[in-house]
Amino acid sequence: MALISNLKDEYDHPTKTDPDTNPKIVADIISSKEPPQPSQDVAEERSRTDWDLKEMHEFLEGDEAKSEEILRLYQSIERDPILQTRPEQFDYTKNEERESVALRINQMSKYLETEPYEKFRRRLQLMTVNDPSLGIRMLVNIGLFLNCIRGNGTQKQYDFWAKTKEAGKVKQLLRLFRYDELGHGFNVAGCEIFATFDEKTDQFIIDTPHIGATKWWIGGAAHSATHTVCYARLIVKDIDYGVKTFVVPLRDSTHNLLPGVAIGDIGPKLGRQGVDNGWIQFTEVRIPRFFMLQRWCKVDRQGNVTLPPLEQLSYISLLEGRVGMATDSYRIGARYTTIALRYAVARRQFSKGDGQPETKLIDYTLHQRRLLPYLALTYLAALGTDKLERQHDQLLKNLDKALATNNKLLLKNTIQSTKSMFVDSGSLKSTLTWLASDLINEARQSCGGHGYSAYNGFGKTYGDWAVQCTWEGDNNVLGMSAGKTIIKTVQQVLNGKQLKDSTLEFLNDAPALSSAKKAVIRIKSHVDDTDRVLKAIAGLISKYAKDLIPVSYQSWDSIGPQRVVLSKFRCHYYLLETFNERLNDRIKAKSPARPHLENIIKLYYVTNVLGPFIDEFLRFGVISPSVAKYITTEYPQKLCAAIRPYVIGLTDSFQQPDNFINSLIGRYDGNVYTNYLTNVTNVNDPTNYKAPYSEALEAMLNRASLEERERFEKSKAVAAKLSQ
């Protein structure tokens, strides 16, 4: 004990000694300063959590059963040696990433065989957040491909491809789905590949007429897929019947390309290098007539074409991807707000002087304003996307039931629900993927230099995420489409129509809202009233849309930007309405979680809706100018200050484990510096201090002088000799 005491005394009161005569004192040899203790800061803030994390997680996920399933799946994925994450995965080359994805597809297919599809779908959704390349490759195969056949094919066609050919188990065949062409993207109706019916042989001839019709961005085409659902123009007896869907084989049983099929890799991308995106050209490729999906449009042996009135339902297969990407926005937001806020508590920067400790990042006003609105957005997105998923699932069940029983009333109501679903999914997909992209970038910047490290996840995720804004419907195109429907809906209501069985029923109040002279939000206390804020958003949508109706008669294109804005309003109304209803239904007034959730919902609509769109609210007289400053400046910071002490508990409520978060500075224990350095040195061997390109560096550093390399031919001595 005496030795420890002496060492402690030297530590606390170091004295100068002669290391040559007395080199035993540690304080004379190494620094004895106290290292930073970020884990203590995180633990202390975690202790402030005064609500039940289980209750909060169930609130976010929708119910106890879903919450339990999510947590069990997190555990299952973390224990699986193929599916679990590792820091070294951030160092993978393109080929290594594709190999990793192939191994994971193989592993995931085994779960597909052994667990209910709904559970597997949830597993795949979670995996997609960490490995988007895996997610899109499997979702294309069992989601888009099978849903396209389910939505466009007959029952016999679905049974054959999904069951007989085992597409539903990712066996025998590996399929892809894409309508993109080199010269056309989201404009499905503009596809130019031909599917010409040959009556003599009872076959369709699939042909790429020119370079612009080359299928492009086809995930899985370059090396993997055996079949594709091809969107092509149906040509029968020289008549163009528009774009239909066809199953076209690409490779034979030995995985070689079939005659007439040309395929190549499109090369590196901004992200998702694990997907072998390719191009496809068809040269008079023949397929049997029954390879055309004929649930709606039918072509018989004699070339007679039947076009049923419900053919618009054939596009319903596109909805699942949009719903999935909206949900991904919630989980990706939860992941990166957790990382950024844990780091903001653990990291200290700059001191106020007088020996005071450095200040936590999260205690800076600006840092709170940068991150806490995104935390609030993530909470609202959790509930909104859960509702959207359930809405989509119910729509598919109703459609199947209506068609199977020939229930015309149910079918009519389902068609009406489908129209709402296109608006809702388009609005949420576009708005939330845009906001999630901003969230990732802002969270990265808030972590300073360490946010730039690949091992903290931001860089790869941003590259992988960016495509969410431009595929499965470019966000601007989706926004314009949803906005157009909203304008038409408001016009119909103003003309006397009442909406039924529609999520847009709140627009039935458009006549009163659009003609209201008095502002909805007039004093500060009104900003605290969520129901009033909902009325304000509905009022803005009504007035905004009514104002655009006369212009729409002249040109829809000229109001494209305003249509996108309307779709954003629709998204925010949907999120706010859903959160408000569940808060009032599920969380009791005396629940410890309630005041925190009330602050969250207020911060959400103040910083994501009222503030960003204050000009529109003022222009249409929905908000009084006297409260504008309060909304944009004073109230947001008041709410941030109320939420700030509980940021660790609020992010813990997402219940995402370290293996899922996969960020060295975002781990649960908050020990950011030890975690960071330990893992970096484990992945990058510090004994490899000579680079593979060291020879080039050494050649530069050790090169001979310029005079020597010029053989001294320009030296004074040579000049003296030659000048004589």
Curated annotation (Swiss-Prot):
Residues 7-21 have a biased composition (Basic and acidic residues). GO terms for cellular component: peroxisome. It is found in: Peroxisome. Signal peptide: none annotated. It comes from the Eukaryota. Residues 1-23 are annotated as: Disordered. GO terms for biological process: fatty acid beta-oxidation using acyl-CoA oxidase; lipid homeostasis. Its cofactor is FAD. Its EC number is 1.3.3.6. One of its GO terms (molecular function) is fatty acid binding. It catalyses: a 2,3-saturated acyl-CoA + O2 = a (2E)-enoyl-CoA + H2O2. Pfam families: ACOX, ACOX_C_alpha1, Acyl-CoA_dh_M, Acyl-CoA_ox_N. Coiled coil: none annotated. Gene3D superfamilies: Acyl-CoA dehydrogenase/oxidase, N-terminal domain, Butyryl-CoA Dehydrogenase, subunit A, domain 2, Butyryl-CoA Dehydrogenase, subunit A, domain 3. Pathway: Lipid metabolism; peroxisomal fatty acid beta-oxidation. Keywords: FAD, Fatty acid metabolism, Flavoprotein, Lipid metabolism, Oxidoreductase, Peroxisome. InterPro entries: ACOX_C_alpha1, Acyl-CoA_ox_N, Acyl-CoA_Oxase/DH_mid-dom, Acyl-CoA_Oxase/DH_mid-dom_sf, Acyl-CoA_oxidase, Acyl-CoA_oxidase_C, AcylCo_DH-like_C, AcylCoA_DH/ox_N_sf. Belongs to the acyl-CoA oxidase family. This is Acyl-coenzyme A oxidase 2. It comes from Candida maltosa. The gene is POX2.
